[in-house]
């Protein structure tokens, strides 16, 4: 049973072989329609990949020779049988003897001739091999290398490609280079030392020191290990030391997940580490129908679990990015099959008309509107795939951050990057159509948004006259904008623009999967310098023409095309053979075209996988660890509503546990539940929380001075320490906005974010205290934590409400029922009569003329003295009970005016 369960688990954890199935379909279709290649089928009629190896050719020839020899034998036996039966009575014994002797002589001669031929062929092959080894090299090894290269070229999956590449490294001696640590391309000593330190701390289970090493040493390009030149010396992979470092990093995170460190503390440190490393974005360029090349790239990264969370697209890249970003992981295989089976019609006006009639329609449209195609078919296709989803809805559905670039049609606006932050209610299909509106090809298109309440569609800017064109014109790869918004510092670019990628083929950054010598690398570098010089000169000429007023709009757009950056840290490019298919640039894609581009995209991504794994391995591992910790915090916390996380400093945090009395007697618990009202519109959705983390200053709140005291208890009880002040209520709820002047309902939250504005205790009324307390006005460091205090039992009947009509009296008339918790220096200085118990009185009103008195109680003075945070109570907020529970009046009375009497509420906290 256990073996079956393990097998089932292993099959469930296997990656979805999306690209492999599509590549197999491509070869099946190509081989089935080709006249020169015959598909090979096994006995079960299953397709077998054709191979151009010599071994396959020899096997086929050998099988053919056997079949020919068998046929000859069958024919000879048949003829002899017929002759024997026909002449059986006519042959005598002498003739039979002569015939047998002749047959024996013929067989002996044929045997001798066959042996001589075999000896001659073996001798010739030996001589050829000897001469080749003397003057050229190892003949047999070169033949084997050719066979393995053919296997690598015709691989149908990434695993087959990797195995063929590793075998090539063994045959060519590149494995020795990978095993050798020393290289001038990176700091091997630093990486080796850090790897050994992490392994030592992990094996010794010194988790605090291991976490410190991770926090202070993990960066993306440690010791220049991200140098792309490290990946042009082998067919697959790079130095084994780098692979060992990445493996040890994953093992370190796995050990921390199983450690006894506090989840909130561990979560904060890992979030800071991820912010220090940065974030990766996948950027897809335009390129007409050749943009379907991106499907193979996304499919490969998806099945290898290397797909970044931030995805951006322009023009054709926006189509692919939007369709794949709005679907769940389980929907991707079905989606790809639907794309293959669909018959697209984007560039043809009317299918029922002939080509000449459609051409006349295009010519008339071009002279009338200045565009060659109409975008109505594109709009219908995008609505079919995307529906009326907005950027916010797509993010809430899949968690992917979709970005689409559009360029303004005029000179008076700036290029825009549309996502769920800048355009949350914009319809994605309208953004895609605007990003595909290449001047002269498609007309400019407006952006539409959906009203979140009514669902009504309307122009985004309020006017349909504001239109946008192809995003590739001004910002094909929005690298700087992504860096500003999402802390992106690493770009994986896929470039298929027909006027760009041939020049990028000469760039040094486009390496991986192929062996390049120093001469080729230097030649590429020189050619790249020449290209940059010519581009700068052309940009200068265009600037001069634009300033002179010669076709200012056109020259400005052309200058933007030449001046922008088209490559990233890792750039995936198609093969140069795409240039010979330029006539398919603006044609409706067929099934064969789709399969070919998907196959080319997948095979172009395979050489970059090892670079992506080493560049982004720690980042993706941290993302998984952070998600795992957040999920564990949700499961282990006794929470009744997820909306409380919307206002916490980090997205998810544990709530304090109830006391033993409260757990035994839930009826006596002071837990208050909040009921939403009509006036309370501040109800956030967890999925609409911050995309990444809070501000960088807020993350410092999770750094504690003594991390060793926050480990897990052996008994199973895990103490949870809030990053804010302690509260009597064991639940963290949101507070209403301070700008609301109406009476506040019974609130449930005593916890304020340390980064939130100053609480009401700092704005104490001067009419009561005379002057503000200097101690309470001091702000503590952003990195100091406030430890929770043990809550005492509270009897709601022992306290009374303050009526609205009461006037404020002197401190000498204070009732003995009201007490103070800890003796603050200011209160001791004002009047010692105030201090008699463990309660704190303060005002909770923004208006000094009509303050509202509230009471803080149930704080343990011993715990407060021990915590050494006596002056930091300013973050607590206690909301009162409803006025209907008031029974007696208090000697502290206030007289609000009649105009504001209904706005003030005085109560005590349960």
Swiss-Prot record:
Catalytic site positions: 315, 470
InterPro entries for this protein: Acyl_Trfase/lysoPLipase, NTE, PNPLA_dom, Triacylglycerol_lipase_N
UniProt short sequence motif GXGXXG, positions renumbered to this chain: 286-291
UniProt PTM comment: Phosphorylation at Thr-675 and Ser-890 by Cdk1/CDC28 stimulates enzyme activity in vivo.
Documented EC number(s): 3.1.1.3
Activity regulation description: Phosphorylated and activated by cyclin-dependent kinase 1 (Cdk1/CDC28). Loses its lipolytic activity in cells lacking nonpolar lipids, but retains its side activity as lysophospholipid acyltransferase.
Positions of region (Disordered): 51-120, 657-683, 713-777, 874-910
Listed GO biological process terms: cell budding; phospholipid metabolic process; sporulation resulting in formation of a cellular spore; triglyceride catabolic process; triglyceride mobilization
Residues spanned by motif GXSXG: 313-317
A single MF term (Gene Ontology): sterol ester esterase activity
UniProtKB keywords: Hydrolase, Lipid degradation, Lipid droplet, Lipid metabolism, Phosphoprotein, Sporulation
Main location: other
Classification via PROSITE patterns: PNPLA
Phosphothreonine: residues bearing it: 675
Biased composition range(s): Low complexity: 889-899
Compositional bias ranges of the Basic and acidic residues kind: 51-66
Domain PNPLA: 282-483
Cross-referenced Pfam families: DUF3336 (PF11815), Patatin (PF01734)
Biased segments, Polar residues type: 70-85, 666-683, 739-768, 900-910
Protein localization: Lipid droplet
pH-activity dependence text: Optimum pH is 7-9 for the lysophosphatidic acid acyltransferase (LPAAT) reaction.
Function field: Lipid particle-localized triacylglycerol (TAG) lipase. The lipid droplet/particle is a lipid storage compartment which serves as a depot of energy and building blocks for membrane lipid biosynthesis. Involved in the mobilization of the non-polar storage lipids triacylglycerols (TAGs) from lipid particles by hydrolysis of TAGs, releasing and supplying specific fatty acids to the appropriate metabolic pathways. Also has steryl ester (SE) hydrolase and phospholipase A(2) (PLA(2)) activities, and catalyzes the acylation of lysophosphatidic acid (LPA).
Protein name: Triacylglycerol lipase 4
């Amino acid at each position: 049973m256990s073996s079956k369960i393990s097998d089932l688990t292993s099959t469930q954890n296997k990656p979805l072989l999306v690209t492999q199935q599509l590549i197999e379909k491509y070869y099946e279709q190509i081989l089935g329609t080709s006249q020169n290649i015959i598909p090979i089928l096994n006995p079960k009629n299953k397709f077998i990949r054709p191979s151009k190896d010599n071994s396959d050719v020899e096997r086929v020839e050998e099988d053919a020779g056997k079949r020919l020899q068998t046929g000859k034998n069958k024919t000879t036996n048949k003829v002899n049988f017929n002759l024997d039966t026909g002449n059986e009575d006519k042959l005598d014994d002498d003739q039979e003897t002569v015939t047998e002797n002749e047959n024996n002589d013929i067989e002996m001669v044929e045997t001798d001739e066959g042996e001589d031929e075999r000896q001659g062929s073996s001798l010739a092959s030996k001589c050829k091999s000897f001469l080749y080894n003397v003057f050229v090299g190892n003949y047999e090894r070169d033949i084997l290398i050719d066979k393995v290269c053919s296997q690598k070229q015709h691989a149908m999956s990434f695993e087959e490609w990797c195995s063929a590449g590793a075998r090539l490294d063994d045959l060519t001696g590149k494995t020795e280079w990978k095993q050798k640590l020393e290289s001038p391309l990176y700091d091997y000593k630093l990486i080796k030392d850090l790897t050994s330190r992490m392994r030592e701390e992990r094996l010794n289970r010194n988790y605090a020191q291991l976490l410190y090493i991770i926090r202070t040493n993990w960066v993306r390009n440690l010791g220049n290990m991200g140098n792309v030149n490290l990946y042009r010396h082998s067919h697959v992979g790079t130095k084994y030391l780098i692979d060992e470092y990445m493996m040890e990093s994953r093992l370190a995170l796995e050990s921390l997940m199983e450690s006894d460190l506090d989840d909130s503390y561990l979560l904060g440190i890992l979030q800071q580490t991820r912010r220090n490393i940065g974030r990766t974005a996948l950027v897809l360029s335009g390129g007409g129908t050749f943009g379907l090349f991106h499907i193979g790239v996304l499919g490969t990264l998806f099945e290898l679990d290397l797909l970044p969370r931030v995805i951006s697209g322009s023009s054709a890249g926006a189509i692919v990015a939007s369709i794949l970003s709005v679907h769940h992981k389980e929907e991707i295989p079905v989606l790809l099959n639907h794309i293959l089976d669909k018959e697209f019609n984007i560039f043809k006006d009317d299918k029922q008309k002939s080509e000449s009639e459609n051409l006349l329609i295009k010519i008339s449209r071009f002279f009338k509107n200045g565009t060659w195609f109409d975008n109505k078919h594109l709009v219908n296709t995008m609505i079919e795939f995307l529906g009326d989803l907005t950027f916010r809805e797509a993010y809430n559905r899949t968690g992917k951050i979709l970005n689409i670039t559009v360029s303004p049609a005029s000179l008076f606006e700036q290029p825009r990057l549309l996502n769920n932050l800048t355009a949350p209610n914009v319809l994605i299909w309208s953004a895609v159509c605007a990003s595909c509106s290449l001047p002269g090809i498609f007309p400019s298109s407006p952006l539409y948004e959906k009203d979140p309440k009514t669902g009504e569609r309307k122009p985004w800017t309020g006017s349909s006259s504001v239109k946008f064109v192809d995003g590739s014109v001004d910002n094909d790869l929005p690298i700087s904008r992504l860096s500003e918004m999402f802390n992106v510092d690493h770009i994986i670019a896929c470039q298929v623009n027909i006027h760009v990628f041939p020049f990028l083929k000469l760039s040094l950054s486009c390496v991986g999967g192929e062996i390049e010598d120093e001469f080729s690398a230097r030649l590429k570098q020189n050619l790249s310098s020449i290209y940059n010089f010519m581009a700068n000169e052309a940009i200068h000429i265009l600037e001069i023409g634009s300033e002179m007023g010669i076709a200012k709009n056109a020259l400005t757009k052309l200058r933007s095309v030449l001046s922008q950056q088209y490559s990233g840290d890792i750039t995936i490019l198609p093969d140069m053979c795409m240039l010979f298919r330029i006539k398919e640039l603006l044609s409706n894609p067929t099934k064969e075209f789709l399969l070919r581009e998907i196959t080319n995209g997948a095979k172009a991504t395979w050489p970059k996988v090892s670079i992506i794994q080493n560049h982004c391995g720690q980042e993706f591992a941290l993302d998984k660890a952070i998600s795992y910790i957040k999920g564990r915090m949700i499961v282990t916390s006794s929470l009744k509503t997820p909306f409380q996380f919307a206002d916490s400093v980090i997205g998810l945090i544990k709530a304090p546990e109830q006391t033993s009395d409260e757990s035994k007697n839930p009826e006596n618990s002071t837990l208050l539940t909040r009921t939403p009202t009509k006036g309370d519109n501040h109800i956030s959705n967890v999925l609409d929380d911050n995309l990444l983390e809070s501000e960088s200053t807020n993350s410092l709140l999770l750094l504690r001075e003594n991390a060793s005291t926050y480990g897990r208890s052996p008994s199973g009880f895990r103490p949870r320490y809030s990053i804010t002040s302690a509260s009597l209520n064991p639940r963290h709820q949101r507070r209403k906005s301070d700008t609301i002047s109406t009476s506040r309902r019974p609130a449930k939250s005593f916890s304020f974010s340390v980064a939130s504005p100053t609480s009401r205790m700092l704005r104490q009324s001067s009419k009561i205290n005379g002057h503000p307390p200097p101690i309470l006005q001091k702000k503590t460091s952003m990195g100091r934590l406030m430890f929770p205090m043990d809550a005492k039992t509270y009897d709601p009947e022992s306290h009374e409400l303050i009526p609205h009509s009461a006037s404020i009296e002197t401190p000498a008339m204070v009732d003995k029922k009201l007490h103070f918790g800890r003796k603050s220096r200011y209160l001791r200085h004002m009047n010692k009569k105030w201090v008699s118990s463990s309660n704190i009185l303060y005002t909770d009103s923004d208006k000094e003329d009509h303050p509202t008195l509230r009471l803080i109680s149930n704080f343990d003075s011993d715990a407060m003295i021990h915590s050494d945070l006596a002056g930091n109570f300013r973050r607590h907020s206690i909301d009162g009970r409803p006025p209907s529970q008031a029974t007696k009046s208090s000697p502290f009375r206030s007289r609000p005016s009649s105009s504001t009497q209904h706005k003030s509420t005085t109560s005590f906290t349960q």
